[in-house]
Swiss-Prot record:
Belongs to the succinate/malate CoA ligase beta subunit family. It comes from Neisseria meningitidis serogroup A / serotype 4A (strain DSM 15465 / Z2491). Its EC number is 6.2.1.5. Pathway: Carbohydrate metabolism; tricarboxylic acid cycle; succinate from succinyl-CoA (ligase route): step 1/1. Succinyl-CoA synthetase functions in the citric acid cycle (TCA), coupling the hydrolysis of succinyl-CoA to the synthesis of either ATP or GTP and thus represents the only step of substrate-level phosphorylation in the TCA. The beta subunit provides nucleotide specificity of the enzyme and binds the substrate succinate, while the binding sites for coenzyme A and phosphate are found in the alpha subunit. Keywords: ATP-binding, Ligase, Magnesium, Metal-binding, Nucleotide-binding, Tricarboxylic acid cycle. GO terms for molecular function: ATP binding; magnesium ion binding; succinate-CoA ligase (ADP-forming) activity; succinate-CoA ligase (GDP-forming) activity. This is Succinate--CoA ligase [ADP-forming] subunit beta. Transmembrane segments: none annotated. It catalyses: succinate + ATP + CoA = succinyl-CoA + ADP + phosphate; GTP + succinate + CoA = succinyl-CoA + GDP + phosphate. One of its GO terms (cellular component) is cytosol. InterPro entries: ATP-grasp (IPR011761), ATP-grasp_succ-CoA_synth-type (IPR013650), ATP_grasp_subdomain_1 (IPR013815), Succ-CoA_synthase_bsu_CS (IPR017866), SUCC_ACL_C (IPR005811), Succ_CoA_ligase-like_bsu (IPR005809), Succinyl-CoA_synth-like (IPR016102). GO terms for biological process: succinyl-CoA metabolic process; tricarboxylic acid cycle. Heterotetramer of two alpha and two beta subunits.
Length: 388
C-alpha cells in the first residue's frame, strides 16, 4: 500500500524528521488560502497521486501568487495525471499539496531504504545525486550510491549513519542532524512495516539545515492487520478498480495491456502461462492467481473480473489440481459462464486431482468451452481463437 506525499511527510515528521512544510488543498480556494498562510515569495503546488515522475508530467508547479496557486490547483484537481509510472489512463488527482518556499539550496541529496531480499535485511541507500531518479544514478554512476545494511538484532547504529553523512559531504552540526534523521527513518521503517522509504531530494538549505523536500513510503500490505491507523490512510481511488475488487476476494490480480485473459492457480504457473501465450504470439491481459485453496465462489468472481476488462477477446483457464479439485473448478467455470453473458472464446486446461471428472463436467455442460490437452495446446488454441 502506497502513501501520498502529504501522508508520508506527516508520518516522518512524527519520528522527528525535518520535512518541508505544506498544506493540503482540495480546491482552488483552499490552495490560495494555503499560499497566503505559508507566506513565502513563492510556493510549490504538487499533485497528490501514487506515482513518480510528477514534475515531468506537469504535476508539480511553482507559483508566485495566490491567484496562480488557485489557477494551478484548479487545473490539476479533478484530472488524471499520466506519468511514466502510470498506465495510459493516469491517476486521479483529488488534492494538491501546497509546499513552502525552500529554495535556493546548497545541494540536493538522496536517502532511501528497502528490504533487501538477498540479505533479508533493511538496506539504506544514499547518494549525492539527489533530485533525479535513483534508477538513473544506479545505471549511469553506481559508484555514487552508498549502501548500509542494518542488522535487525541491534538496529541502525549511529556510527553507520555518521559514515553515510561523511560520504555525503556533510559537516559539523549537519552530521548529528543527519544521524538523527536516518535513525528516525529506520525507526519509522521498522515500526510501520515499510516496504519502501525514499526522500528525494533531501535538501541542504542555505542555512545548512536538512529538509525532506519529498517523501515516498510504501507499506507492506501483509502487515496492515496490525497497523489499523496506517490502513485508514489507504486511498482506493489510486488503485486499479479491478485489482481493488480482486483483493476483496483474496485474488492476486494485475492488469496488463493484452487481450487474452488468464485464470491460473499458483503464481509460478501463472507466469509460465503468460510466457507461453507470448511465445505463441499472444498478449496476456492480466496476471490472475486464484490461489492453491481456490473455492467455487472465488473462481466465479475471478471469471467476472477477467470479463470486466473490455479489451479481453479470449480467456485461458489453466488449473493444476493439487490442493484444489479440478471438478470443483469445472463446476465454477460452468456456473460463471451461465451467470455471465460470455461472448469470447474460453479455453480450459485441467490437470491433476479429478481432472477427468472436471473435463467431463465441461463437455456435458453444453457450453462453448474448448478443452485443451496440455499447456502448449491450450496456448495455441486461445491465440488462434483470438486471432480468428
Amino acid at each position: 500500500m502506497n502513501l501520498h506525499e502529504y501522508q508520508a511527510k506527516e508520518l516522518l515528521a512524527s519520528y522527528g524528521l525535518p520535512v518541508q512544510g505544506g498544506i493540503l488543498a482540495h480546491n482552488g480556494e483552499e490552495a490560495a488560502a494555503a499560499y497566503d498562510k505559508l507566506g513565502g515569495k513563492f510556493a510549490v503546488v504538487k499533485a497528490q497521486v501514487h506515482a513518480g515522475g510528477r514534475g515531468k508530467a506537469g504535476g508539480v508547479k511553482v507559483v508566485k501568487s495566490r491567484e496562480e496557486a488557485k489557477e494551478v490547483a484548479e487545473s490539476l484537481i479533478g484530472t488524471n495525471l499520466v506519468t511514466y509510472q502510470t498506465d495510459a489512463n493516469g491517476q486521479p488527482v483529488n488534492s494538491v499539496l501546497v509546499c513552502e518556499d525552500m529554495y535556493p539550496v546548497q545541494t540536493e541529496l538522496y536517502l532511501g531504504a528497502v528490504v533487501d531480499r538477498s540479505t533479508r535485511r533493511v538496506t539504506f541507500m544514499a547518494s549525492t545525486e539527489g533530485g533525479v531518479e535513483i534508477e538513473k544514478v544506479a545505471a549511469e554512476t553506481p559508484e555514487k550510491i552508498f549502501k548500509v545494511t542494518v542488522d535487525p538484532l541491534v538496529g541502525l547504529q549511529p556510527c553507520q549513519a555518521r559514515e553515510v553523512a561523511f560520504q555525503l559531504g556533510l559537516k559539523d552540526k549537519q552530521i548529528n542532524e543527519f544521524v538523527k534523521l536516518m535513525t528516525g527513518a529506520y525507526k519509522a521503517f521498522v515500526e510501520n512495516d515499510f516496504a519502501l522509504f525514499e526522500v528525494n531530494p533531501l535538501a541542504v538549505r542555505e542555512n545548512g539545515a536538512l529538509a525532506c523536500v519529498d517523501g515516498k513510503i510504501g507499506i507492506d500490505s501483509n502487515a496492515l492487520y496490525r497497523l489499523p491507523k496506517i490502513a485508514e490512510l489507504r486511498d482506493k481511488s489510486q488503485e486499479n478498480e479491478r485489482e481493488l475488487k480482486a483483493s476483496e476476494f483474496d485474488l492476486n490480480y494485475v492488469a496488463l495491456e493484452g487481450n487474452i485473459g488468464c485464470m491460473v492457480n499458483g503464481a509460478g504457473l501463472a507466469m509460465a502461462t503468460m510466457d507461453i501465450i507470448k511465445l505463441k504470439g499472444g498478449q496476456p491481459a492480466n496476471f490472475l492467481d486464484v490461489g492453491g485453496g481456490a473455492t467455487k465462489d472465488r473462481v466465479v468472481e475471478a471469471f467476472k473480473l477477467i470479463l470486466e476488462d473490455k479489451s479481453v477477446k479470449g480467456v485461458l483457464i489453466n488449473i493444476f489440481g493439487g490442493i484444489v479439485r479440478c471438478d470443483m473448478i469445472a463446476e465454477a467455470i460452468v456456473a460463471a459462464v451461465k451467470e455471465i453473458n460470455v461472448d469470447v472464446p474460453v479455453v480450459v486446461r485441467l490437470e491433476g486431482n479429478n481432472a477427468e471428472l472436471g473435463a467431463k463436467i465441461l463437455n456435458e455442460s453444453g457450453l462453448k468451452l474448448t478443452s485443451a490437452d496440455g499447456l502448449n495446446d491450450a496456448a495455441e488454441k486461445i491465440v488462434a481463437a483470438v486471432n480468428a
